Amino acid sequence: MVPRSRCPHCGHQITALENVPVLSWLCLRGKCRQCRTPIPVRYPAVELLTGVLAAASVWHLGFGITGIAAALFCCVLVALTFIDFDTQLLPDSLTLPLLWGGLLLNLTSGAMAPLSDAVIGAMAGYLSLWSVYWLFKLLTGREGMGYGDFKLLAALGAWFGWQALPAIILMSSVIGAVVGVSLIVFRNHGRQQPIPFGPYLAGAGLAMLFFGGQVMALMGMGAPVSVMATGG
């Protein structure tokens, strides 16, 4: 990737051999090769999580276009999750390719949803959160979420079709509410302090990828595509 990774403490440029996921951290014993500053365990943990999800998606959907696309889908969602936790932002450089990737996959194979459902899902995903955003702003004068959340839900709609949106919104909202209340009660998180919504949308997207059939059945909805029916 450009620019090359550097140690935030001493500025040492990370070489290719020092940047092998998980293995490099183990070989370096969790420290920068130059200044010996400890490297947070979060880095290899995120790398391991990404690898496990990517491998699971290929195992789940097979080693083909759909499985590889799903692996990339998982990688982008993990990246968006931790970027949003750190910065309260969901960059267009990730959300927009995710959206177009879902449309392209369904255009070429219809593996996740028919193209018409994917296009409607992208539009409905964006407009649903956009509407909530402006309604909340009109009522309170504050911004309840960011535009990146709209684009992420649009991307999930492009992947799974409009039928999956109610389940995705419900799952992410419930999990987000539980986490938010827990932070306020147990960790003295300020009521006016923002809580990122992107990670919970991403989690709901992963749930739809692996367990879409069960989720839709549990909510009394028909699974729109054969891929969802194979979930789990």
Task: Indicate residue ranges for each PLM-predicted region.
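Membrane-proximal soluble regions of multi-pass membrane proteins
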Residues: 1-42, 197
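Hydrophobic, aromatic-rich membrane-embedded alpha-helical segments
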Residues: 19-27, 166, 170-179
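Select subsegments of transmembrane alpha-helices in polytopic membrane proteins
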Residues: 40-47, 92-94
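Zinc-dependent deaminase
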Residues: 45-83
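Alpha-helical membrane-inserting segments
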Residues: 53, 57, 61, 104-105, ...
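Functional transmembrane core segments of multi-pass inner-membrane proteins
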Residues: 67-175, 217-232
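Interfacial loop-to-transmembrane junctions
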Residues: 147-148, 181-207
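Extracellular/periplasmic helix-loop-helix junctions in multi-pass membrane proteins
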Residues: 186-194, 214-223
